[in-house]
């Protein structure tokens, strides 16, 4: 959404007041107003405005080039951690596991992420850490009032964590370098 927000505009002022998105169990307060977020959210079955980074990658997963585009991207599927991790994890990568939608694509991206991580010379610091998933079912009434809270453990450093982290690092470092080369300060 940042490309569509003009400095000093009412939306920019709201974002500056809120400063960041706040995440909490069962909800969040977005930095941008909901009507702006809804234009960019990755809802399945629609085309969303996006700043895309395309990487040219050799057969041995070496990045040989890149291209950035402002475009509309068709969202064919919105893959969620809690749906993917049971079928895409350390065990299924080693043993093969059952087929599932996007398995080949996720495996290919995981292989790229592994090479990107090795190229940085920095293994993930969170390999053996535990994280938690929180959810609140506001439709369920409990003795304490509305909202049943569920907290589940999940291991950090999973193949999906690595895939997301390494591709975000690649995007941030690629765009950071481009901004630096152009003499443009940015956060």
Annotated model-derived regions:
Residues 1-187:
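Electropositive polyanion-binding surfaces
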């Amino acid at each position: 959404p940042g490309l569509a927000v003009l400095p000093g505009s009412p939306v920019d002022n709201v974002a500056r007041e809120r400063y960041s998105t706040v995440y909490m169990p069962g909800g969040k307060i977005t930095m941008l107003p909901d009507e702006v977020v809804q234009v960019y959210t990755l809802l399945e079955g629609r085309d969303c405005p996006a700043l895309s980074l395309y990487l040219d990658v050799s057969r041995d997963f070496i990045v040989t080039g890149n291209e950035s585009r402002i475009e509309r991207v068709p969202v064919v599927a919105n893959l969620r951690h809690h749906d993917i991790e049971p079928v895409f994890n350390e065990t299924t990568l080693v043993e093969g596991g059952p087929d599932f939608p996007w398995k080949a694509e996720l495996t290919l991206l995981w292989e790229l992420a592994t090479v990107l991580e090795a190229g940085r010379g920095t293994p993930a610091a969170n390999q053996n850490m535990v994280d938690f998933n929180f959810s609140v079912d506001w439709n369920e009434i409990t003795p304490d009032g509305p909202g049943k809270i569920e907290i589940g453990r999940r291991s950090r450093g999973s193949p999906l964590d690595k895939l997301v982290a390494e591709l975000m690092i690649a995007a941030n470092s690629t765009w950071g370098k481009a901004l630096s080369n152009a003499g443009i300060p940015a956060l």
